Amino acid sequence: MQFSPFIPILLTLRTALRHLPLFALAGVLCLPVLALLGAWLPGVDSNAPLPVLKAMAQTVLPGYLWTTLWLAIGVGVGAALLGTAAAVAVTLFDFPGRRSFEWLLLLPLAMPAYVTAYAYTDFLQFSGPLQTWARAAFGLEGRLLPEVRSLGGAVLVFVVSLYPYVYLLARAALAERIAHLMEAARMLGAPLARRIAAVALPLARPAVAAGVALALMETLADFGVTSYFGIQTFSTAIIKAWLAMDDGRVAAQLSTMLLALVLLLLWLERRSQSRLRFSARGAGGAAVSLPRALTGWPAVLAGTVCAVPVFLGFVAPVAFMLRPLAADWSVL
């Protein structure tokens, strides 16, 4: 009995020791972030980076910021629409090829975004095979397609490359956590369109937001596509400060600004979700909402919704890169 006051302390110590490896792993993972934050600490040359940052803030930094924001908005909206539409199609409907599309829609993840950018640019640019053939075949002159290496082109490349993040998480949410609620809505007489709009999509919002967050973080951290397309974003500014200006401290400070922007976006989305109590947790029951069989034009539409992302994100880039082999196998 005389040791009873120490029992809670011993139990707490035991719990802390049991989680010590997790704490150590978390500390190791935080080291890169702490290193970036250390760039703001005063040092021997503490005044050196300030004029550089002030000069960038007065000249190029606002343009970098706006371009980055527009890129993030375009990629976020596009990936959400493309990924959610594909997830709804393969989860709630049954049409020819549905089983194949369930895994085909993941193939763009195997294609790096910068490789997709190279493939589209080579095929669609002014001197590319498509415009060259069109000018020769129809007697046309000048540029026939918008410039691929632009902000809009970058948005397209990122959307078709990163939408699987949204698709994968949204499909899991629709298949595992919302089936019983969709079945309940059906038994109450709600039509299919209302069940999708009022039940499936709102409940899948946390999963869609998580997928969009993953796509945005990869977009903001990308340098290959933005550099190749000549788009001035925060990532290109960081690389320029590090390599062209040979100033690692300014690059680290710019990196913390980009990290703060990402955290702000995540916080805003988390706050908006906290005000809405719609997230379903767990399966909640054994009811299963079977996919609705589609025939005719509805089946064609559902198949098109799934086929277009696969074609743009994987089939077309691979075909563009394999095109030289069809003309000359000696390149192997």
Q: Each predicted region: which residue ranges?
A:
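Short coil/turn motifs that cap or connect alpha-helices
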Residues: P96, A190-P191
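Membrane-water interface segments at the C-terminal ends of transmembrane alpha-helices
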Residues: I9-D45, T59-A175, L203-F223, A251-R270, ...
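Flexible interhelical linker loops that connect adjacent transmembrane helices
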Residues: S272-V305
